[in-house]
Amino acid sequence: FSEQSHLNSGSVMEGLKKLPGLIVSDVAGMMYQGKQLEVFMDARPLNIYSNELTSYLESLPANSIEKVEIITQPGAEFPATSGGAIINIVTSKNAKKYLSATYSNGYSYTKYDKSRHRFNNSLLVNAKNKWFGWQVQLGQNFNQGYQRTNFQNETTVLSKNTTDRENRFYFFKTGLKFDFKKDRLLVNYDFTTSNNNALIDASGFGFETSDKSKNKLNRNDVALNYQKRFDDATKKLDFRFNVNSVNNNFDLNNRVSGNSVLDNGYDQLFYQFKTDYSQEFSFLEKTKFSTGVLADKLEFEAQNLGLTNLDYQRTTLSAYSEFQSSYKKFGFILGGRLESYTIDGNTDTDELIPFNQTRFFPNASIQYNIIPQVFVNANYNKKISLPNTSALNPNNTNYQNPNVSFFGNPNLEPTIFDNYEFKISAFEYFFIGYSRSDANNQVMNRIITDGDGAASISENIPQVTIHNFNLGLPVPYMLFTKGLKETLKFDFNPDEINFLYLYVGHQKHILPDVSGKGLWFFNAMSQIVLPSKIKFTANFNTSTTGGNYFYYENRAPFSQQFDITFAKKFLDNNLSVSVYCNDIFNTNKQGFNALGTNLVYESKNDSRRVGITLNYKIPTKNKLAKEEGNILNNDKKEDQPAIGN
């Protein structure tokens, strides 16, 4: 993100939506190339979901993060609860010896029914001396937003809403690194807080109301990581302890009478301890052996009107081993993870059905390297997805009126995934692949009829199969001026050439009681370096319509929009300035038929916006300053696996 001006302009969520293959929707959440995503930040589970996760990513400035890693074939070293894929948002940047700092700022503007503004500021300060290194990153985001939504059936408008939002978001991240000869200790503390207000005018069959919602969320995260190193550089032993807490309060009040409509909240506490050991030895040509154990516990308590109506506990114990080997042009990965789950709790009226289960999750990959940087890869892994606390929460932390409600389900059961993938990749940019994911007991959000209205619920679906095809094709414009032979020499910097990148994906969801068709997804991104080294980037997303996406048939293309960005660096490349316009033609909207009902859902956000963003690396006067590894990300990848993702 930090080097891609079209991605780091705006919020993290706006940048993620531009990634080929990543789908974000109001009704179905986030998926990447047909795989359910688990969201990590700095290699640690974020542990927030649904509308809280969306709000968090919309509030986090994209120019405050370094990169996004998407792991499409998570091996045994990753928790089996990762589902099908992991997205890791890395906020940290490289520390430098002696004091250095980076300042980031952004502003954007929209005008629909009225003018609205967004602005963010962040500062990263880091330094290193002979005893320890440290980093501090802090920032804020002010976000005004607009949304209109519509629920209707064939003859009646059930609910027509306009929402005027004002969100305030603050974050503070610290990192300390202590070196003890070969060993090191990393200490991290993160704090984020958001205060979101919304004015909601709604009308529909039999009602008209004007409400105000307040949503306050605080998140604390502490991590300790001790990295033991040996004379044998391939031998590594890591110990990590992580504590994460989330507190959320949601209130909805009528603006006319002042009466309370909703008074809900929850408290969540998550502990995790893990240790990992790895070592290389001579077998075939080179083999790496990894093993480790993990224990974590989640405590979740939901309140309604000050009374606890869900008390939920989950404990996980796991152990894994994995081998990565290479022999001539072949690479192999074989691993397995054993996980044990204990889930219990109670609502205000009854005890939850206890869940005690131990499962084994194998994974295997084989890769054939045709020539350097060109390979064929086949992968299988079994994963599980435990119901997240947003889906379990029986209380409404979204919005409701007399005709529209949102419900969680405390009795949801885990989902088991069998994931298969085959891929051909060349030079990191071209790829063609097919994947299949078979899910048993899939947790799914559905819109159903509820009396004379509509309700959003979560439930288990016995069997879901997702077929996914992907193609990524880079087209350097020099191909037309210098020919194929010169282009294939790859004697150039990709960031400094003119090119077009095309992505095509096809996804089909097969459900037991739905007969639907698949969806095609398209993305085109072009970079042109203009005179004075001004970088112009254009990005276009769209999809076909009429296909089923789980229990929804899309009436409008997913995230259809055209964005442009102009970027230039100044002051010896220390100052980066970008000017952008997102959704120029104002085409980004959502529209779905809720299958099995006669309900239609439509929504439109203020997606057309113009803005400017800047990053200024305050130069150090000390010529001895040099970069060190980042320390806000406490799970540093020190080596690459035998098989790339």
Give the predicted meaning of each segment.
Residues 105-111, 129, 140-144, 180, ...:
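Transmembrane beta-strands of outer-membrane beta-barrel pores
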Residues 91-107, 145-148, 190-203, 241-242, ...:
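Surface-exposed extracellular loop regions of Gram-negative outer-membrane beta-barrel proteins
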Residues 112, 143-270, 312, 385, ...:
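Flexible loop and strand-edge segments within Gram-negative outer membrane beta-barrel domains
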Residues 12-15, 53-57, 69-70, 82-107, ...:
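N-terminal periplasmic accessory domains that precede
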Residues 270-274, 413, 431-502, 513:
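Outer membrane beta-barrel strand-and-loop segments of large Gram-negative receptors
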Residues 219, 354-355, 374, 384-440, ...:
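Outer-membrane beta-barrel signature, preferentially recognizing the C-terminal barrel domain
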Residues 13-49, 85:
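Extracytoplasmic beta-strand/coil segments of soluble accessory domains associated
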